[in-house]
Amino acid sequence: MDAIKKKMQAMKVDKDGALERALVCEQEARDANTRAEKAEEEARQLQKKIQTVENELDQTQEALTLVTGKLEEKNKALQNKKKTTKMTTSIPQGTLLDVLKKKMRQTKEEMEKYKDECEEFHKRLQLEVVRREEAESEVAALNRRIQLLEEDLERSEERLGSATAKLSEASQAADESERARKILENRALADEERMDALENQLKEARFLAEEADKKYDEVARKLAMVEADLERAEERAEQGENKIVELEEELRVVGNNLKSLEVSEEKANQREEEYKNQIKTLNTRLKEAEARAEFAERSVQKLQKEVDRLEDDLVLEKERYKDIGDDLDTAFVELILKE
């Protein structure tokens, strides 16, 4: 039973370890899911940033197109003004030159301004392109990270499934062992109760045997007393017979005391009858004592047979209990080997 309890405790420890490993795997799976959700959220935010950068890039390209169009329009206007200047040669030279210089300065300033804006837009465009490339690289890194997290999640799920399967097997084995333990405990309790009952029966049989021995001793003692009384009665009967003989001789010798002799004879006859009755009574009591002694001997023999049978049953029950223990050890060894 101690070995069974130790094995059950070991199996409970294994079950607790499997439960702890399953909880750890579940926690790792939850952490992996959390990391995957966080990575997906970061990917969504980066996607939004990329969308924003693309929108800004489109706006920048549109602004660049507008600026380029305006620059072309200014160039066309400048060329038209040059043509107009050639056509208006009748205007005074000083005024015309001043106007042209002023227009040229304004045009140059506007061109410089548009060039600066164009360069600024180019820089912003390059910056947006760089930002877009960085965002794409971050997205690629996040995608790789998500893939690694998904692989880690799959491995965690596999470990969780394996741990769950092992936990289920351990639970089933523990349940089967628990059922087997309960069955064996019930059998052991039944065997113990039966052994207690047999021990009680054996004690009762021994007590009855002791009582029978006591009764036998008492009967033997009474029988010895009866035999002694019988011997004394026989002696008294012999003495009575001797007295009768003497009285008869006295009766034959003494004729004068006939009445007294007759009275003595009657008394002797009465005493003889009494002795005979006592002898019959003693014989009856002797037969009864012998019958009781025989009954006591038969009772002792029956009780001895019952004691022998109970001892044989006890030996058989011990052997059966030993066989059950061996079967239990074999079953636990098979369970351990299966694991």
From Swiss-Prot:
Q: Which SUPFAM superfamilies match?
A: Tropomyosin
Note the InterPro entries from the entry. Tropomyosin
- State the coiled-coil residue ranges: 14-285
Q: Which UniProt keywords apply?
A: Actin-binding, Coiled coil, Cytoplasm, Cytoskeleton, Muscle protein
Q: Does the keyword Transmembrane apply?
A: no
What superkingdom heads the lineage? Eukaryota
Gene Ontology biological-process entries? actin filament organization; dendrite morphogenesis; muscle contraction; oogenesis; pole plasm assembly; pole plasm oskar mRNA localization; regulation of lamellipodium assembly; response to hyperoxia
Q: Where is this region: Disordered?
A: 160-179
What Gene Ontology terms describe what this protein does at the molecular function level? actin binding; actin filament binding; protein kinase binding
Q: Does the keyword Manganese apply?
A: no
Entry's free-text remark on domains? The molecule is in a coiled coil structure that is formed by 2 polypeptide chains. The sequence exhibits a prominent seven-residues periodicity.
The UniProt function text for this chain reads: Tropomyosin, in association with the troponin complex, plays a central role in the calcium dependent regulation of muscle contraction.
Q: Which family does it belong to?
A: Belongs to the tropomyosin family.
Q: How does it assemble?
A: Homodimer. May interact with Unc-89 (via protein kinase domain 2).
Q: What is this protein called?
A: Tropomyosin-1, isoforms 9A/A/B
Q: Could you tell me which species this protein originates from? A: Drosophila melanogaster (Fruit fly)
Q: Which gene encodes it?
A: Tm1
